[in-house]
UniProtKB/Swiss-Prot annotation:
Its main location: cytoplasm. InterPro entries: Gln_synt_N, Gln_synt_N_sf, Gln_synth/guanido_kin_cat_dom, Gln_synth_cat_dom, Gln_synth_gly_rich_site, Gln_synth_N_conserv_site, Glutamine_Synthetase. Residues 119-369 form the GS catalytic domain. Homooctamer. It comes from Drosophila melanogaster (Fruit fly). This is Glutamine synthetase 2 cytoplasmic. Keywords: ATP-binding, Cytoplasm, Ligase, Nucleotide-binding. Its EC number is 6.3.1.2. It is found in: Cytoplasm. Belongs to the glutamine synthetase family. Residues 32-112 form the GS beta-grasp domain. Gene3D superfamilies: Glutamine synthetase, N-terminal domain (3.10.20.70), Glutamine synthetase/guanido kinase, catalytic domain (3.30.590.10). One of its GO terms (molecular function) is ATP binding.
């Protein structure tokens, strides 16, 4: 990646090899550096801070509750700013390695109630009610690399790249950009213990995708949020910005989504296509409610993306079809032929909260709400 492209990025100018001499310093066996990660008041951005532990935790319940300045994260007033972090999932730290950990956290107000952007609490309650149906989720997370000035990485500064066509799953310096970051992120997710299942270059140049899952219940949200944290954190080291904006470039360019693949035990068994069709029928009656749940601005972000063009459905209409990427719900050709499997909800935006998406889907297809 050329220095010219990154010349405006202060992070890219730092000599990363200097850090290695300090990361290689030995620590006492029982010392653990823990990075607490949480969702801020935007509902789409992440924050983190570190603390030292004198023991090696085996579960999130062993970790201490911590606090932070919620007024600086759009989650509290300055006059009463203490907001609390409750650990919910532990991952291995690919940056510090060893016994060091990353900790996904829930956020709570001073009075013990969840913050407005803590969507995990109610999602977990719903997931527990549906546990007997063994719901599995897989999410295809699309994102776009930007220069430090907010321009898509590798795009001409005073023009546009060639039309879409050669970039999807492309190979070659004139077709894909920043594969180094993609590979670093992929490996870091695997090391951390995130159930990442693959990655590929997307339709728009500088756009990529990674897939998480299949995961059972709430774990899809934990894994996807931590995978997003790693994406932003690794991009930071390269001096590049990763955006989850669902339509980063207006015009004749694909947007970015978080296509969500869903199945229950009944759908995965022989004859499960009937259960898939029943779920699709239920979803057809709750389209507006799902649109509100599928991006952090209650549908405003998705309105820029779900236009009926560029492999999307219309935000105003529900549709379903076999192998049709222009529908709200796609049933893969192989699933239709096998008579069992899963369906794909193509409506969630790239910056969606996966906890909100999972909760909405389970309420509709399992709880009949």
């Amino acid at each position: 990646m050329s220095a010219r492209i990154l010349e405006d990025s202060p992070n890219a100018r730092i000599n990363k090899t200097i850090l290695d001499r300090y990361l290689s310093l030995p620590l006492q066996e029982n010392i653990v550096q823990a990075t607490y990660v949480w969702i801020d008041g935007t509902g789409e951005d992440l924050r983190c801070k570190d603390r030292t532990l004198d023991f090696i935790p085996q579960s999130p319940k062993e970790l201490p509750v911590w606090n932070y300045d919620g007024s600086s994260c759009y989650q509290a007033e300055g006059s009463n700013s203490d907001t609390y972090l409750y650990p919910v999932a532990i991952y291995k730290d690919p940056f510090r390695r060893g016994n060091n950990i990353l900790v996904m956290c829930d956020t709570y107000k001073f009075d013990g109630t969840p913050t407005d952007t803590n969507k995990r609490k109610t999602c977990l309650e719903v997931a527990n009610k549906c546990a007997a149906e063994e719901p599995w989720f897989g999410i295809e997370q699309e994102y776009t690399f930007l220069d430090f000035d907010g321009h898509p990485l590798g795009w001409p500064k005073n023009g546009f790249p060639g039309p879409q066509g050669p970039y999807y799953c492309g190979v070659g310096a004139n077709k894909v950009y920043a594969r180094d970051i993609v590979d670093a992120h992929y490996r870091a997710c695997l090391y951390a213990g995130i159930k990442v299942s693959g990655t590929n270059a997307e339709v728009m140049p500088a756009q990529w995708e990674f897939q998480v899952g299949p995961c059972e219940g709430i774990s899809i949200g934990d894994d996807l949020w931590m995978a997003r944290f790693l994406l932003h954190r690794i991009s930071e080291e390269f001096g590049i910005v990763s955006t989850l904006d669902p339509k980063p470039m207006p015009g004749d360019w694909n947007g970015a989504g978080a296509h969500t693949n869903v199945s229950t035990k009944a759908m995965r068994e022989d004859g499960g296509i009937r259960d898939i069709e029943k779920a699709v029928a239920k979803l057809s009656k709750c389209h507006e409610r799902h649109i509100r749940a599928y991006d952090p601005k209650q549908g405003q972000d998705n309105a820029r993306r779900l236009t009926g063009k560029h492999e999307t459905s219309s935000i105003n209409d529900f549709s379903a079809g076999v192998a049709n990427r222009g529908c709200s719900i796609r049933i893969p050709r192989g699933v239709n032929d096998d008579g069992k499997g899963y369906f794909e909800d193509r409506r969630p935006s790239s910056n969606c909260d996966p906890y909100s998406v999972v909760e909405a889907i389970l309420r509709t297809i399992c709880l009949d709400e």
